[in-house]
Amino acid sequence: MNSAPTFMSLYSMPASDSTNETSTINLPATTVKGRNNYDSYGNVDIQENPTDLDAKNLTRFNYTQPTGTFGVGAVQFKNQITFDNDFDFNIRVANNRQSNTTGADGWGFIFSKNDANTYLKDGGILREKGMADAAGFRIDTGYSNKDPLDKTQKQAGQGYRGYATFVKNDAQGNTSKVGSGNPGGSATDPKSDFIYYADNTTNDFDGKFHGQKLNNVNLKYNASNETFTATYAGKTWTATLSQLGLNKKDSYNFLVTSSQHGNGDSGTYADGVMRTDLEGATLTYTPKAQEGTPETTTEKIPYETKREFDPKLAPGTEEVVQKGENGEKTTTTPIYVNPTTGEKVGEGTPTTKVTKDPVDEIVHYGGEKVPQGHKDEFDPNAPKGSKEEVPGKP
Protein backbone atom coordinates (compact mmCIF):
# COMPACT_ATOMS: atom_id res chain seq x y z
CA MET A 1 0.00 0.00 0.00
CA ASN A 2 1.49 3.30 -1.05
CA SER A 3 0.07 6.62 0.05
CA ALA A 4 0.75 9.94 -1.63
CA PRO A 5 -1.10 13.22 -2.15
CA THR A 6 -3.34 13.57 -5.18
CA PHE A 7 -1.60 16.70 -6.44
CA MET A 8 2.12 17.32 -6.65
CA SER A 9 4.14 20.42 -7.53
CA LEU A 10 6.47 20.19 -10.52
CA TYR A 11 9.91 21.72 -10.02
CA SER A 12 12.39 22.98 -12.59
CA MET A 13 15.99 22.58 -11.53
CA PRO A 14 18.95 24.93 -12.11
CA ALA A 15 22.09 23.71 -13.82
CA SER A 16 24.00 21.40 -11.46
CA ASP A 17 24.70 17.73 -10.95
CA SER A 18 21.77 15.36 -10.43
CA THR A 19 22.47 14.86 -6.70
CA ASN A 20 22.11 18.57 -6.00
CA GLU A 21 19.06 18.80 -8.23
CA THR A 22 17.16 16.00 -6.49
CA SER A 23 18.02 17.35 -3.05
CA THR A 24 16.08 20.55 -3.78
CA ILE A 25 12.87 18.66 -4.56
CA ASN A 26 10.80 18.35 -1.39
CA LEU A 27 8.53 15.32 -1.47
CA PRO A 28 5.92 14.58 1.20
CA ALA A 29 6.32 11.82 3.77
CA THR A 30 4.73 8.56 2.72
CA THR A 31 3.89 5.22 4.33
CA VAL A 32 4.48 1.95 2.50
CA LYS A 33 3.29 -1.49 3.56
CA GLY A 34 4.04 -5.00 2.35
CA ARG A 35 6.91 -7.22 1.29
CA ASN A 36 6.72 -6.01 -2.32
CA ASN A 37 8.69 -2.97 -1.10
CA TYR A 38 11.72 -5.16 -0.30
CA ASP A 39 14.17 -7.35 -2.19
CA SER A 40 15.31 -10.66 -0.66
CA TYR A 41 18.89 -11.92 -0.49
CA GLY A 42 20.45 -15.12 0.79
CA ASN A 43 18.60 -17.70 2.85
CA VAL A 44 15.13 -16.13 2.83
CA ASP A 45 11.84 -17.71 1.77
CA ILE A 46 8.09 -17.51 2.45
CA GLN A 47 6.25 -19.75 4.91
CA GLU A 48 2.70 -19.62 3.60
CA ASN A 49 0.78 -21.36 6.40
CA PRO A 50 2.67 -21.69 9.70
CA THR A 51 0.92 -23.98 12.17
CA ASP A 52 2.24 -22.32 15.32
CA LEU A 53 1.53 -18.67 14.53
CA ASP A 54 -1.70 -16.92 13.65
CA ALA A 55 -0.43 -15.43 10.39
CA LYS A 56 0.13 -16.29 6.75
CA ASN A 57 2.94 -15.72 4.27
CA LEU A 58 5.65 -15.06 6.82
CA THR A 59 9.13 -14.14 5.62
CA ARG A 60 11.45 -16.84 6.93
CA PHE A 61 15.22 -16.74 7.51
CA ASN A 62 17.73 -19.60 7.97
CA TYR A 63 15.38 -22.39 6.86
CA THR A 64 16.92 -25.82 6.01
CA GLN A 65 20.42 -24.54 6.60
CA PRO A 66 22.83 -27.43 5.80
CA THR A 67 24.72 -28.99 8.69
CA GLY A 68 27.99 -27.30 9.49
CA THR A 69 27.30 -24.15 7.45
CA PHE A 70 26.44 -20.56 8.29
CA GLY A 71 23.02 -19.22 7.39
CA VAL A 72 22.64 -15.60 6.35
CA GLY A 73 19.75 -13.67 4.82
CA ALA A 74 18.42 -10.16 4.36
CA VAL A 75 15.56 -8.16 2.97
CA GLN A 76 16.47 -4.70 1.70
CA PHE A 77 14.08 -1.78 1.28
CA LYS A 78 13.96 -0.84 -2.39
CA ASN A 79 14.45 2.89 -1.80
CA GLN A 80 17.14 4.60 0.21
CA ILE A 81 16.65 6.38 3.52
CA THR A 82 17.93 9.82 4.55
CA PHE A 83 17.94 11.34 8.02
CA ASP A 84 16.98 14.92 7.27
CA ASN A 85 13.39 13.78 7.89
CA ASP A 86 11.60 11.46 10.33
CA PHE A 87 11.55 7.69 9.92
CA ASP A 88 9.18 5.16 11.51
CA PHE A 89 9.33 1.38 10.98
CA ASN A 90 7.05 -1.26 12.50
CA ILE A 91 7.46 -4.99 11.98
CA ARG A 92 6.43 -8.11 13.89
CA VAL A 93 9.11 -10.73 14.48
CA ALA A 94 9.04 -14.24 15.96
CA ASN A 95 12.27 -15.59 17.44
CA ASN A 96 13.64 -19.11 17.26
CA ARG A 97 13.38 -21.25 20.43
CA GLN A 98 16.65 -23.10 19.95
CA SER A 99 19.44 -22.69 22.50
CA ASN A 100 21.40 -19.51 21.98
CA THR A 101 24.60 -21.52 21.51
CA THR A 102 23.35 -23.24 18.35
CA GLY A 103 20.29 -21.29 17.18
CA ALA A 104 19.89 -18.04 15.29
CA ASP A 105 22.05 -14.98 15.94
CA GLY A 106 19.01 -12.71 16.18
CA TRP A 107 17.70 -9.72 14.22
CA GLY A 108 19.70 -6.88 12.74
CA PHE A 109 18.02 -3.69 11.53
CA ILE A 110 20.79 -2.05 9.55
CA PHE A 111 21.48 1.31 7.92
CA SER A 112 24.42 1.16 5.54
CA LYS A 113 25.82 2.76 2.39
CA ASN A 114 26.65 -0.79 1.33
CA ASP A 115 23.94 -3.12 0.08
CA ALA A 116 22.70 -6.60 0.95
CA ASN A 117 25.25 -8.28 -1.31
CA THR A 118 28.03 -6.79 0.83
CA TYR A 119 26.14 -7.94 3.93
CA LEU A 120 26.06 -11.53 2.64
CA LYS A 121 29.82 -11.40 2.11
CA ASP A 122 30.99 -9.42 5.16
CA GLY A 123 28.24 -9.86 7.74
CA GLY A 124 26.14 -7.26 9.52
CA ILE A 125 25.74 -6.12 13.14
CA LEU A 126 24.87 -9.39 14.93
CA ARG A 127 28.41 -10.62 15.56
CA GLU A 128 31.74 -9.16 16.62
CA LYS A 129 32.46 -7.92 13.11
CA GLY A 130 30.58 -7.11 9.90
CA MET A 131 30.51 -4.72 6.97
CA ALA A 132 32.31 -1.44 7.54
CA ASP A 133 30.51 1.65 8.86
CA ALA A 134 27.12 -0.04 9.22
CA ALA A 135 24.88 0.83 12.17
CA GLY A 136 21.48 -0.04 13.57
CA PHE A 137 19.48 -1.91 16.18
CA ARG A 138 20.39 -5.44 17.24
CA ILE A 139 18.23 -8.08 18.92
CA ASP A 140 20.76 -10.73 19.92
CA THR A 141 19.57 -14.30 20.47
CA GLY A 142 22.81 -16.20 19.87
CA TYR A 143 25.85 -16.46 22.12
CA SER A 144 29.37 -16.45 20.67
CA ASN A 145 32.52 -16.69 22.78
CA LYS A 146 34.26 -14.67 20.05
CA ASP A 147 31.97 -11.69 20.54
CA PRO A 148 33.09 -9.28 23.30
CA LEU A 149 29.64 -7.72 23.40
CA ASP A 150 28.01 -11.07 24.20
CA LYS A 151 30.37 -11.42 27.16
CA THR A 152 29.74 -7.86 28.31
CA GLN A 153 26.01 -8.48 28.17
CA LYS A 154 26.57 -11.62 30.31
CA GLN A 155 24.73 -13.73 27.78
CA ALA A 156 27.00 -16.66 28.66
CA GLY A 157 25.19 -19.24 26.59
CA GLN A 158 22.31 -19.71 29.00
CA GLY A 159 18.98 -20.72 27.52
CA TYR A 160 16.84 -18.00 25.99
CA ARG A 161 19.02 -15.23 27.40
CA GLY A 162 19.28 -12.40 24.93
CA TYR A 163 19.65 -8.65 24.75
CA ALA A 164 18.97 -5.69 22.49
CA THR A 165 20.96 -2.53 21.84
CA PHE A 166 21.97 0.00 19.23
CA VAL A 167 25.35 -0.78 17.68
CA LYS A 168 27.76 0.66 15.13
CA ASN A 169 30.57 -0.82 13.07
CA ASP A 170 33.82 1.07 12.65
CA ALA A 171 35.82 1.41 9.43
CA GLN A 172 37.26 -2.09 9.98
CA GLY A 173 33.80 -3.53 10.67
CA ASN A 174 34.28 -4.04 14.42
CA THR A 175 30.91 -3.89 16.19
CA SER A 176 30.34 -2.00 19.45
CA LYS A 177 27.42 -0.90 21.60
CA VAL A 178 26.23 2.73 21.50
CA GLY A 179 23.36 4.64 23.07
CA SER A 180 21.24 3.87 26.11
CA GLY A 181 20.79 0.63 28.02
CA ASN A 182 22.90 -1.13 30.63
CA PRO A 183 24.59 -4.43 29.75
CA GLY A 184 23.37 -7.46 31.65
CA GLY A 185 20.74 -6.87 34.30
CA SER A 186 17.32 -8.47 34.29
CA ALA A 187 14.27 -8.68 32.08
CA THR A 188 12.29 -6.59 34.57
CA ASP A 189 14.83 -3.74 34.68
CA PRO A 190 13.66 -1.15 32.11
CA LYS A 191 17.20 0.27 31.82
CA SER A 192 18.77 -3.12 31.17
CA ASP A 193 19.49 -4.50 27.69
CA PHE A 194 18.54 -7.98 28.87
CA ILE A 195 15.55 -9.81 27.37
CA TYR A 196 14.30 -13.38 27.35
CA TYR A 197 14.00 -13.86 23.61
CA ALA A 198 11.81 -16.98 24.02
CA ASP A 199 10.32 -19.19 26.72
CA ASN A 200 8.64 -22.54 27.27
CA THR A 201 5.21 -21.29 28.24
CA THR A 202 2.07 -23.01 27.02
CA ASN A 203 -0.10 -20.06 28.01
CA ASP A 204 -0.03 -17.31 25.42
CA PHE A 205 -2.41 -15.16 27.41
CA ASP A 206 -0.58 -14.75 30.71
CA GLY A 207 0.36 -11.15 29.94
CA LYS A 208 4.08 -11.91 29.71
CA PHE A 209 6.42 -11.42 26.79
CA HIS A 210 6.80 -14.50 24.60
CA GLY A 211 9.49 -13.87 22.03
CA GLN A 212 8.74 -16.96 19.97
CA LYS A 213 5.41 -15.38 19.05
CA LEU A 214 5.01 -12.43 16.69
CA ASN A 215 5.92 -9.27 18.62
CA ASN A 216 6.27 -5.75 17.28
CA VAL A 217 9.59 -3.98 16.85
CA ASN A 218 9.30 -0.22 16.45
CA LEU A 219 12.31 1.67 15.13
CA LYS A 220 11.86 5.40 14.70
CA TYR A 221 13.98 8.48 14.13
CA ASN A 222 13.23 12.07 15.13
CA ALA A 223 15.00 14.46 12.76
CA SER A 224 14.50 17.48 15.02
CA ASN A 225 16.72 16.07 17.79
CA GLU A 226 18.58 13.50 15.64
CA THR A 227 17.60 10.63 17.94
CA PHE A 228 16.65 7.03 17.20
CA THR A 229 14.28 5.12 19.46
CA ALA A 230 13.73 1.36 19.41
CA THR A 231 10.95 -0.38 21.32
CA TYR A 232 10.74 -4.15 21.81
CA ALA A 233 9.81 -6.62 24.55
CA GLY A 234 8.44 -3.82 26.71
CA LYS A 235 11.74 -1.91 26.72
CA THR A 236 13.04 1.19 24.95
CA TRP A 237 16.52 2.07 23.68
CA THR A 238 17.82 5.34 22.23
CA ALA A 239 20.88 6.46 20.28
CA THR A 240 21.78 9.64 18.44
CA LEU A 241 22.66 10.00 14.79
CA SER A 242 26.19 10.96 15.80
CA GLN A 243 26.62 7.95 18.11
CA LEU A 244 25.68 5.66 15.23
CA GLY A 245 28.14 7.36 12.90
CA LEU A 246 25.41 8.39 10.46
CA ASN A 247 24.70 11.84 9.02
CA LYS A 248 21.93 13.81 7.39
CA LYS A 249 23.69 14.44 4.10
CA ASP A 250 24.01 10.82 3.00
CA SER A 251 21.55 8.20 1.76
CA TYR A 252 21.47 4.72 3.27
CA ASN A 253 20.14 1.29 2.43
CA PHE A 254 17.85 -0.20 5.09
CA LEU A 255 18.09 -3.95 5.74
CA VAL A 256 16.32 -6.42 8.00
CA THR A 257 18.70 -9.33 8.57
CA SER A 258 19.13 -12.60 10.42
CA SER A 259 21.83 -15.25 10.48
CA GLN A 260 22.73 -18.55 12.11
CA HIS A 261 26.38 -19.08 12.95
CA GLY A 262 25.82 -21.60 15.75
CA ASN A 263 24.92 -24.34 13.30
CA GLY A 264 28.24 -23.97 11.53
CA ASP A 265 30.23 -23.54 14.73
CA SER A 266 28.82 -26.73 16.22
CA GLY A 267 29.06 -28.77 13.04
CA THR A 268 25.66 -30.29 13.72
CA TYR A 269 22.20 -29.40 12.55
CA ALA A 270 20.37 -26.94 14.76
CA ASP A 271 17.18 -25.09 14.00
CA GLY A 272 17.75 -21.39 13.44
CA VAL A 273 14.52 -20.34 11.76
CA MET A 274 13.52 -16.72 12.37
CA ARG A 275 10.25 -15.37 10.99
CA THR A 276 8.74 -11.96 10.40
CA ASP A 277 5.48 -10.54 9.11
CA LEU A 278 7.03 -8.45 6.35
CA GLU A 279 3.67 -8.35 4.58
CA GLY A 280 2.24 -6.36 7.48
CA ALA A 281 5.32 -4.18 8.07
CA THR A 282 4.88 -0.42 7.66
CA LEU A 283 7.58 2.13 6.95
CA THR A 284 7.01 5.88 7.01
CA TYR A 285 9.75 7.98 5.46
CA THR A 286 10.33 10.93 3.15
CA PRO A 287 11.54 9.66 -0.21
CA LYS A 288 14.13 11.45 -2.30
CA ALA A 289 13.39 12.15 -5.93
CA GLN A 290 15.17 9.80 -8.29
CA GLU A 291 16.22 10.14 -11.89
CA GLY A 292 13.60 8.89 -14.31
CA THR A 293 13.71 8.38 -18.06
CA PRO A 294 14.89 11.63 -19.71
CA GLU A 295 12.53 13.39 -22.10
CA THR A 296 13.89 14.11 -25.60
CA THR A 297 12.62 16.39 -28.35
CA THR A 298 14.02 16.94 -31.85
CA GLU A 299 14.01 20.07 -33.99
CA LYS A 300 14.81 20.56 -37.66
CA ILE A 301 17.80 22.68 -38.67
CA PRO A 302 16.96 24.12 -42.16
CA TYR A 303 19.66 23.84 -44.80
CA GLU A 304 21.03 26.89 -46.63
CA THR A 305 21.09 27.38 -50.39
CA LYS A 306 24.30 28.65 -51.96
CA ARG A 307 24.40 29.94 -55.56
CA GLU A 308 27.64 29.78 -57.49
CA PHE A 309 28.41 31.13 -60.99
CA ASP A 310 29.46 28.50 -63.49
CA PRO A 311 30.86 29.89 -66.76
CA LYS A 312 30.34 26.51 -68.38
CA LEU A 313 26.57 26.82 -68.12
CA ALA A 314 24.55 28.55 -70.80
CA PRO A 315 23.26 31.99 -69.88
CA GLY A 316 19.98 31.87 -67.95
CA THR A 317 20.33 28.21 -66.89
CA GLU A 318 20.73 26.66 -63.42
CA GLU A 319 21.83 23.27 -62.14
CA VAL A 320 21.58 21.77 -58.62
CA VAL A 321 24.97 20.15 -58.07
CA GLN A 322 24.41 19.25 -54.37
CA LYS A 323 20.99 18.57 -52.94
CA GLY A 324 20.28 20.22 -49.58
CA GLU A 325 19.43 18.18 -46.48
CA ASN A 326 17.95 19.45 -43.21
CA GLY A 327 19.91 18.85 -40.04
CA GLU A 328 18.55 17.91 -36.62
CA LYS A 329 19.16 18.95 -33.02
CA THR A 330 18.04 16.95 -29.99
CA THR A 331 17.15 18.45 -26.61
CA THR A 332 17.39 16.13 -23.59
CA THR A 333 15.68 17.10 -20.33
CA PRO A 334 16.48 15.15 -17.12
CA ILE A 335 13.34 13.98 -15.35
CA TYR A 336 12.97 13.29 -11.62
CA VAL A 337 10.29 11.04 -10.16
CA ASN A 338 8.86 10.08 -6.79
CA PRO A 339 10.31 6.58 -6.24
CA THR A 340 7.20 5.48 -4.37
CA THR A 341 4.62 6.47 -6.99
CA GLY A 342 6.70 6.87 -10.15
CA GLU A 343 5.13 10.31 -10.60
CA LYS A 344 7.16 13.04 -12.32
CA VAL A 345 8.07 15.70 -9.76
CA GLY A 346 10.79 17.78 -11.40
CA GLU A 347 12.92 18.59 -14.40
CA GLY A 348 16.63 19.19 -14.71
CA THR A 349 18.47 21.59 -16.99
CA PRO A 350 17.94 20.72 -20.67
CA THR A 351 20.95 20.14 -22.91
CA THR A 352 20.84 20.52 -26.70
CA LYS A 353 23.11 18.70 -29.11
CA VAL A 354 23.30 18.77 -32.91
CA THR A 355 22.72 15.16 -33.89
CA LYS A 356 22.85 15.77 -37.64
CA ASP A 357 24.55 18.65 -39.45
CA PRO A 358 22.58 20.27 -42.29
CA VAL A 359 23.93 19.90 -45.83
CA ASP A 360 23.96 23.06 -47.96
CA GLU A 361 22.19 22.99 -51.29
CA ILE A 362 24.55 24.24 -54.02
CA VAL A 363 23.11 25.67 -57.23
CA HIS A 364 25.27 26.58 -60.24
CA TYR A 365 23.99 29.19 -62.68
CA GLY A 366 25.09 30.53 -66.04
CA GLY A 367 25.67 34.19 -66.95
CA GLU A 368 22.98 36.59 -68.03
CA LYS A 369 21.99 36.63 -71.70
CA VAL A 370 23.57 39.78 -73.26
CA PRO A 371 21.39 41.56 -75.85
CA GLN A 372 22.89 42.11 -79.30
CA GLY A 373 24.98 45.28 -79.40
CA HIS A 374 25.31 45.34 -75.55
CA LYS A 375 28.70 45.33 -73.91
CA ASP A 376 29.60 45.22 -70.21
CA GLU A 377 32.62 47.18 -69.05
CA PHE A 378 34.11 47.37 -65.56
CA ASP A 379 34.56 50.87 -64.10
CA PRO A 380 36.93 50.82 -61.09
CA ASN A 381 35.75 54.31 -60.10
CA ALA A 382 32.06 53.43 -59.91
CA PRO A 383 30.44 52.85 -56.49
CA LYS A 384 30.38 49.21 -55.38
CA GLY A 385 27.32 47.36 -56.64
CA SER A 386 26.26 50.23 -58.92
CA LYS A 387 25.24 49.87 -62.52
CA GLU A 388 24.98 52.58 -65.17
CA GLU A 389 23.52 52.35 -68.64
CA VAL A 390 25.43 54.37 -71.24
CA PRO A 391 23.77 54.73 -74.65
CA GLY A 392 25.91 53.53 -77.51
CA LYS A 393 26.74 55.44 -80.64
CA PRO A 394 25.51 54.25 -83.97
Give a label for each model feature.
Residues 4-288:
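Polar, low-complexity loop segments and adjacent catalytic/binding residues used for recognizing
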Residues 289-394:
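Extracellular modular ligand-binding repeats in secreted and cell-surface proteins
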